[in-house]
Design a protein with these regions (language model features):
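Residue-level preference for well-ordered alpha-helical positions
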Residues: 307, 362-365
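Extended, regular secondary-structure scaffolds
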Residues: 97-213
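Glycine-rich and small/hydrophobic secondary-structure elements
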Residues: 333-349
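Generic structural marker for isolated residues within well-ordered, non-membrane alpha-helices
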Residues: 70, 303, 358
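Extended, charged amphipathic alpha-helical segments
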Residues: 182-334, 378-380
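Short amphipathic alpha-helical segments
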Residues: 75-83, 223, 227, 294-298, ...
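Extended, helix-rich architectural segments
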Residues: 1-128
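Extended amphipathic alpha-helical segments with heptad-repeat/coiled-coil character used for oligomerization
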Residues: 368-382
Length: 382
């Protein structure tokens, strides 16, 4: 996508290489992408995101004044429908964009996760000044790329749109927008006066960048990335421990015979019933003792480390009561307070993004004519 946007608009991704690698790593951790010497079946990143999202929206209610126009209320209802998805995308990638999509009355919203758009310019505070997106469209046997570049300016928002017919893995040639019926109403360049920023509501995680110190937002579990990989490696080692602990019977190598596939194995007729205890007739059975408790203790240490780094309540990931760990009432209260602060910060981030989205609906509704009403105050209860 970065190369296509660069070819179409002559702009590069301003994200540093270190941050781009970190974003890929966060999504790999969430989706359990396979890595050498790791067992990703545990998916602790998905557990963290899922539990926090349910806690944040447990008693959520957003409302507008009773006399608000129906179109604006419809927009808020559409925003609520993508709320949980958007927050989870933001927790995974650090940032999620909420794109208002004009409807006959009001707006629907699309949640754009961090790996689905390219920041083309940011200010010193990390706010987007230009952003690029791409949508792949398929018509019969042909594939098209709809590229969009949004740029914030003093005169308002400028949206540039290009449609390309893909040639294999290359961008191909630029074709008119009316080539596809779904793009027939689009124009190559559109200026929307009075629209703030890039015309997208931004949901950012309230964490300082711990990857490269840039203005980019980071994943909620970015500080614990190393521990999450250590957990996956430990799980793979534990699996190996159980595999190596299987009972085995030792036999002389000269008893092995090749089978039809060329693999050496014991013949079935070598195994006969024994009338006595195998230990009394000279057969050696290998059944080693497992060391799983050491691995499980280490696993709990890593999980508690994740909880401490991410401000989670003890027991969210690890076992709540662990033998050998004495905790005072002050420590327990401090952990609960950290978790409460974490949840409140996430609630505040969503409330700010929701308010920004409603403000955009007021501005865009006046321009498009599908919601020509002034902005109404949004109230969010938790």
């Amino acid at each position: 996508m970065e190369n296509f946007l660069e070819q179409a608009f002559g702009k590069n991704d301003v994200t540093t290489p270190k941050m781009r690698a970190a974003v890929r790593e966060w999504f790999d951790l969430y989706y359990g992408a396979p890595r050498p010497q790791e067992d990703t079946a545990l998916r602790p990143a998905a557990l963290i995101v899922g539990k926090l999202c349910r806690t944040v929206f447990a008693e959520y209610e957003a409302r507008l004044p009773a006399d608000t126009a129906p179109a604006r209320k419809a927009s808020l209802a559409a925003l609520d429908r993508v709320a949980k998805t958007a927050l989870q995308y933001a927790m995974i990638g650090g940032e999620c964009l909420l794109k208002p999509v004009p409807q006959k009355t009001g707006f629907a919203f699309a949640a754009l996760r961090r790996d689905c758009y390219v920041p083309l310019a940011r200010d010193a505070h990390g706010q987007l000044l230009a952003v690029g997106t791409m949508e792949i469209l398929s018509v019969e046997s042909r594939r098209y790329a709809l590229l969009e570049r949004r740029t914030a300016g003093a005169d308002g928002l400028t949206i540039e749109t290009r449609l390309f017919e893909l040639n294999g893995q290359t961008l191909g040639r630029c074709v008119p927008l009316n080539t596809l019926p779904v793009c027939a109403d689009l124009v190559p360049q559109l200026v929307l006066p009075g629209v703030p920023g890039v015309g997208l509501a931004v949901l950012r995680m309230p964490l300082v960048n711990c990857v490269d110190g840039s203005a980019d937002a980071v994943s909620l579990y970015a500080p614990a990335t190393g521990l999450l990989h250590a957990l996956a490696r430990l799980e793979a080692q534990l699996n190996t421990e159980f595999a190596n602990g299987a009972s085995r019977v030792f036999a002389s190598e000269d008893l092995l015979r090749p089978d039809a596939a060329g693999q050496r194995a014991l013949r079935d007729d070598l195994f006969v019933g024994l009338p006595d205890d195998p230990a009394n007739v000279g057969v050696t059975v290998y059944s080693p003792a497992l060391r799983e408790q050491s691995f499980l203790n280490r696993k709990q240490d890593l999980l508690r480390g994740c909880e401490s780094l991410l401000g989670l309540r003890r027991g969210i990931l690890s076992e709540q009561e662990c033998s050998g760990e004495a905790r005072t009432a002050t420590e327990i209260a401090a952990a609960a307070a950290d978790y409460d602060v974490t949840v409140r910060e996430l609630q505040g981030a969503w409330a700010a993004a929701a308010d920004e989205a409603m403000q955009l609906c007021a501005v865009l509704g006046s321009l498009y004519g599908n919601d020509p009403h002034p902005a109404a105050p949004l109230t969010v209860d938790w």
